[in-house]
């Protein structure tokens, strides 16, 4: 049974801003993609944001809100309730007596009367949620599903990345072109999946695959990326020549060089789509947020323009060409060896 992405909405940063790191009581201003006004998002505010995204996406897909009790919700995040704990601490409120990833799922289950599933596989959390939602639809368990990826600023995550010397201090986020570190971001996205296309803007999901990298828990190995791409192409029944563009991982770190090498060798005919220079690395939310980024580009008929010139003009970046109808590879890599990906085939691209 086929699976289609029929609607996507997101709330992400509009511009690159700054966030203060406080490691060892030494303050330093680092670039950060801030999407929300609140320094720390409380749990009630997070519920409000998730509900608003669910409503926007459902209406965009042409669904009635009354049918959501038959639509499973799959959540993907890295932080889950950490921002709320920090909010409570900052405002002199007691911390939760129990710590559980299922707190948000329990609330949404009561709110909508449906099954809710939580995924925590580091940076691929919401990507894995997409993969499992698609499996549910393929196996006829449901006709529709919602996938939500969310990541809110919290100091625990931010300071840990800073302590590992992984964060960029540059004014622009230039992965692949001039990798100088990761720029983190916050945001939320919601994807609507169905077992049939409901409009010209629907995208078919093909070749959905996952892989666990057993070689390296903190970096992405070349062999694992090659195997992931092979699996996706094989499951989709496509050749490398048929892939018109690739939404790359491209975090701006040490793995960029390896990723570029693999793409040049395995997909020499494809252009590359960079998403993180516009939204930052949103960690567990990136699967949903970057898929929404790509889906919205299909609706607009073009990708947003980069605000910097590539240092390497030989990079085949898709940002400088109109989008065309065809097959788009979309993959995600994460700490702990988790990886996932699929191919999107839009039914129609505006002016495409």
Where do the language-model regions lie?
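Conserved "HGTGT" condensation-loop signature of ketosynthase/thiolase-family condensing enzymes
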Residues: 1-116, 135-138, 154, 163-183, ...
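Compositionally biased, intrinsically disordered linkers/stalks adjacent to structured regions
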Residues: 120-122
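Short conserved active-site loop signatures built around small residues
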Residues: 126
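Short, conserved alpha-helix that lines the donor NDP-sugar binding/gating region
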Residues: 130-134
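Glycine-rich anion/phosphate-binding loop at the beta-strand->alpha-helix junction
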Residues: 144, 149-153
């Amino acid at each position: 049974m086929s699976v289609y992405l029929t609607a996507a909405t997101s709330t992400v940063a509009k511009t690159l801003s700054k966030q203060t790191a406080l490691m060892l009581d030494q303050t330093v201003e680092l670039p950060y993609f801030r999407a929300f006004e609140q320094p720390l998002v409380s749990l009630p505010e997070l519920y409000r944001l998730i509900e608003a995204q669910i409503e926007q996406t459902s209406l965009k897909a042409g669904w009635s809100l009354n049918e959501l009790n038959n639509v499973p919700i799959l959540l993907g995040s890295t932080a889950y309730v950490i921002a709320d704990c920090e909010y409570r601490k900052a405002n002199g409120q007691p911390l939760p007596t129990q710590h559980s990833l299922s707190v948000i799922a329990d609330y949404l289950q009561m709110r909508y009367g449906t099954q809710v599933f939580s995924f925590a596989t580091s940076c691929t959390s919401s990507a894995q949620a997409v993969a499992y939602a698609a499996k549910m639809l393929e196996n006829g368990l449901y006709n529709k599903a919602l996938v939500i990826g969310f990541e809110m600023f919290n100091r625990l995550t931010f300071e840990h990345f800073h302590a590992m010397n992984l964060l960029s201090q540059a004014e622009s986020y230039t992965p692949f072109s001039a990798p100088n570190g990761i720029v983190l971001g916050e945001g939320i996205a919601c994807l609507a999946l169905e077992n049939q296309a409901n409009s010209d803007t629907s995208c078919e999901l093909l070749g959905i695959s996952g892989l666990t990298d057993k070689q390296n828990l903190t970096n992405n190995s070349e062999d694992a990326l090659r195997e992931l791409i092979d699996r996706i192409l094989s499951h989709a029944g496509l050749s490398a020549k048929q892939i018109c563009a690739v939404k790359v991982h491209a975090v701006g770190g040490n793995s960029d060089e390896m990723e570029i090498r693999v793409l040049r060798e395995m997909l020499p005919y494809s252009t590359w789509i960079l998403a993180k220079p516009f939204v930052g690395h949103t960690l567990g939310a990136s699967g949903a947020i970057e898929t929404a980024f790509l889906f919205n580009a299909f609706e607009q008929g073009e990708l947003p323009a980069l605000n910097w010139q590539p240092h390497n003009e030989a990079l085949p970046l898709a940002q400088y060409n109109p989008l065309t109808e065809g097959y788009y590879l979309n993959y995600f890599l994460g700490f702990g060896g988790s990886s996932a990906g699929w191919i999107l085939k839009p039914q129609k691209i505006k002016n495409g």
